[in-house]
Amino acid sequence: MTRALLSVSDKTGLVPFAEKLVALGYELVSTGGTHRVLAAAGLDVIAIDDVTDFPEMLDGRVKTLHPRVHAGLLARRDLPEHMAKMAEFDITPIDMVVVNLYPFKSTIQKDGVTEAEAIENIDIGGPSMLRSAAKNFAGVLPIVDPADYDVVVDKLQSGSIDADYRKSLAAKVFQHTAAYDALIADYLTVAEFPNNLTLPYEKFDDMRYGENPHQKAAAYKTALPEDYSVLNANILHGKQLSYNNIRDADAALRIIAEFEETTVVTVKHMNPAGIGQGSTIETAWDKAFAADDVSIFGGIVALNREVDAATAEKMHAIFLEIIIAPSFTPEAFDILSAKKNLRLLTVPFTTTVPQKLEVTSVLGGVVVQERDLYTESKANFEVVSKVQPTEAQLRAMIFAQKVVKHVKSNAIIVARDGQTLGMGAGQPNRIDSVVYAIQKAAVKSGFDEAVLASDAFFPMDDSVQYAAENGIRAVVEPGGSIKDKDSIAKADELGIALVFSGTRHFKH
């Protein structure tokens, strides 16, 4: 008779599956709570301590860690010496293991959970049985996911369980136990950058393709999800998010989290196209749209206030890929959902993004750093010019600094009164970014109180000179160049304000 060992925390589908195994001729062995559930259902099931001839002990910490269990799992059926040794010790082979693990993840997500509670939910016996079964998949079926129960039964009934399917179940086990261990390691780790980096992710979706149609792609989210994330957004309307949609929406969420004020952010290819602030969400939209009414076409929009009907009517008039907001009024939703392909997402707005490690792939490995969550403040500004910036210019500098950190370096932002006017992004030469940003801004009505912000220092005074000669009256940059004195002298010569923020914001 074939034997199946069942020991599960998640009892979903357990009894029907076990009943079908019995009908297929399986003898059932089980542990603890699983044994009680199966027995209560009227199934003939052998208790694990009747197999091991040893009682469960240490509050259930030791149940299946026994040679009679693991020999039954690890013995190779194709080796006569293995089977002879099994017979010598009267050990029955185990042909199937059905195990899912203690709920460590859900335990540590509970409010007020103690370390002791978390540790008690670290499974030892379960992973050991799964790994033994998965190692010996040629002779043992390892099943870790209740979603596989029906498929396994169908294949057993049809006799279609082949080597490839066995191998796929084994791979699933090792993926599952690796993720389980990674989550535990992450929970217990206190080092900022441990010697071995284990980051558990769970598949969110298979993408139609990646950045381009010839690239395969999938999306994964962290095992402990962040509420403020496009991967945990509520999709109210529209089709599946693409790879590029997710990247752009993520960029929009990162930018808008900088602002408590009523703000609208538009994004194209992960750079802000236009940002506007106003007393209402409609006026904020008007300013964001006016900031760049061309680049916004086919873009992503994020708003940090509820979308009303008036704002929805204006957004409906142009082609957009995604609109993200905390909520939509019923009227706004009706207006926008009339567009079949427009994705409408809700995400709970926050300005408190948690500090996490950012992982970037490079050939042969990854580089890891903290998120850039530096908070801009006038208290950290140093006015280095003779001309003092006005209060309006200082406010614009704070706004522009919050934006420029999210623009691909070399990054320049021209801004005024809660509105971006021009952006220079991704140029290898900083002066080229300065020129482009000012040229973009020049189509707006004048530069009164407009400021220019740079993500990094000016290596020479040409950026200050170009800004001043083209109507900019105040500049903010980190400082730190060996030629800072030249930029300061040029600002004084041309009568503009120059402020050092003291903080660089490269973005690659």
From Swiss-Prot:
The keyword Transferase applies. It catalyses: (6R)-10-formyltetrahydrofolate + 5-amino-1-(5-phospho-beta-D-ribosyl)imidazole-4-carboxamide = 5-formamido-1-(5-phospho-D-ribosyl)imidazole-4-carboxamide + (6S)-5,6,7,8-tetrahydrofolate; IMP + H2O = 5-formamido-1-(5-phospho-D-ribosyl)imidazole-4-carboxamide. GO terms for cellular component: cytosol. InterPro entries: AICAR_Tfase_dup_dom_sf (IPR024051), Cytidine_deaminase-like (IPR016193), MGS-like_dom (IPR011607), MGS-like_dom_sf (IPR036914), PurH-like (IPR002695). Keywords: Hydrolase, Multifunctional enzyme, Purine biosynthesis, Transferase. The IMP cyclohydrolase activity resides in the N-terminal region. This is Bifunctional purine biosynthesis protein PurH. It comes from Leuconostoc citreum (strain KM20). The gene is purH.
